[in-house]
């Protein structure tokens, strides 16, 4: 089997979005699964729209999710000399030609064609032109598209695709200022980089016949193509910013783990063994672009949150602390290692994102300044206050290094007072955490420690 070589080739005119990252992941997995090469190419030939910040953001996103590319990043803006050579080669071989048609002439032609209910297109008037070039017009360069031929290719996702070259006009490969066009530079670079397999969005499907024309004109080997359907929202519409079409790095800020995001995106449009959770090793073992779906996939926040919660629960306390560093939350330095582990173990089971986990740390460690009103109103204060006073005395005697001792202290109150567990547990939870829900009470007592637990009960009794 020949070496698999893939690439991801974004334009730095905006930040890397979720659909682009999915395409990059598919290319990465296919190359790595076959011990091949995966390249990153920045398509920055549109000098007026390029953004250095956007290019850097693409690189930053790659680093975050762990997509390591081979070799140096290839920037198309540094390769204009190469493109110029190949344009001249096509001109010299009479496979391309200068077109002197002005914009006004082209616009007029299109209007005439529309009036005749024809598809607007260039009419090849300069294809075999041998006369004196008109003055004052900087020509474009057009490729001579073979006439009355069928261009066919077997797309790995779409199946057999056929286009009659009569549907194509002699498209431009170099603008009047000499800069090459998109389809031309993509073809040149894919060929010179030895790309064997092109996995990209199906919005590029219409470009493929034009690129095949160029491959053939230059006697380049044509790669395999896989055109992946777009990602839709759950209503079947194009992704909007609200529905997930946002900068990839925003997902890091929202508290998603890279493992969860890669797993989620790899499953958008690809399936294997009815599994949902895939480690990187499993993705590399099972991924094959031939298994990509031909219909669009739907972005589901519910599924992403479920996956992220799964990965969050399986993180060690040490890694969680590293992952939590970008988020603001209470100081943890007063907790001993056992308390810290207990805090993170308790909260990661109740959190879907790192951001949510950071908020829940505050909910435990910051003493309540007010109490959940609907829970507070239901309390029988005449019963509750003596119970908490009695429990406070038990806590002062208790060994806070043993959670079972704390649990026994709570059950002792319930048994001695012959009351239902909720009659005591609910007000105790309100005193410690300020609300009716949250982590278990024995965990809360253990994490807060004796001094803080007693202090919070005393503050509650004052209210």
Swiss-Prot record:
Reactions listed under catalytic activity: tRNA(Glu) + L-glutamate + ATP = L-glutamyl-tRNA(Glu) + AMP + diphosphate
Chief place of localization: cytoplasm
GO biological process: glutamyl-tRNA aminoacylation
Molecular function (Gene Ontology), one example: zinc ion binding
Extent of motif 'KMSKS' region: 238-242
InterPro entries, sorted: aa-tRNA-synth_I_cd-bd (IPR045462), aa-tRNA-synth_I_codon-bd_sub2 (IPR020751), aa-tRNA-synth_I_CS (IPR001412), aa_tRNA-synth_I_cd-bd_sf (IPR008925), Glu-tRNA-ligase_bac/mito (IPR004527), Glu/Gln-tRNA-synth (IPR000924), Glu/Gln-tRNA-synth_Ib_cat-dom (IPR020058), GluQ/Sye (IPR049940)
Motif 'HIGH' region per UniProt: ranges: 10-20
Subcellular location: Cytoplasm
CDD domains: GluRS_core
GO cellular component, one term: cytosol
EC assignment: 6.1.1.17
Chain positions recorded as ATP binding sites: 241
UniProt keywords, alphabetically: Aminoacyl-tRNA synthetase, ATP-binding, Cytoplasm, Ligase, Nucleotide-binding, Protein biosynthesis
Gene3D superfamilies linked: 1.10.10.350, HUPs
Family of this protein: Belongs to the class-I aminoacyl-tRNA synthetase family. Glutamate--tRNA ligase type 1 subfamily.
HAMAP family documented for this protein: Glu_tRNA_synth_type1 (MF_00022)
Subunit field text: Monomer.
Function, as annotated: Catalyzes the attachment of glutamate to tRNA(Glu) in a two-step reaction: glutamate is first activated by ATP to form Glu-AMP and then transferred to the acceptor end of tRNA(Glu).
Name of the protein described by the UniProt record: Glutamate--tRNA ligase 1
